[in-house]
Amino acid sequence: MGDFLNLFTEDVVEVFLWTDESFPVYFEYELSPLDYELPIIIPNYNGKFYGWQPWHYEGDRRTRHATSTLGGEKLSGGIVSGWRAEFFIPYKLLVPLNQVPPVSGTKWRVNMYRIDYDNATTHFAWQKISKSFHEYNNFGTFIFE
C-alpha cells in the first residue's frame, strides 16, 4: 500500500467536504494507520463517481498529516490496540471547489468516517448513511464563523 492507492480497502479514516450544495462535486481525504494518504476530488453524478487526484500537490497545496499506533508497532498487518490520526487540509488544495476559502456564514456539508477491518468490518460515521459513504445529501453541516 502507498499514497494515492485504494486505501479504503484497509483500515482508514476519511473526511468528505462538500463545499457547494448546488454542485455534486466534493473533496475526499483518506489517511491510513501507516500514514498513507489519498486526497481526491469526487464528481458524483447520480452515484457514478469520477475521482480526480490533485495536480501540483506540493508546498502550501499539500496536506500535513501524521499517525501513531497504540499497543504495537506501526506495521502493515501489525497487531495494535488502536491508532491515531491527525491531518491539516489547506484551503489552497480545495480551490477548484466553490466557496473556498469560506467566509463567515459559509456552510459546507461534511461527513467523517472510520473503517475498521481488524475482525468483522466496522464502519463509524459522524452522520448516518444507508449504503455508501458518498451519500452527500446525508452529510452534516459545518457553519463557518
Locations of the language-model features?
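Structural preference for beta-rich elements and adjacent junctions enriched in aromatics
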Residues: 1-145
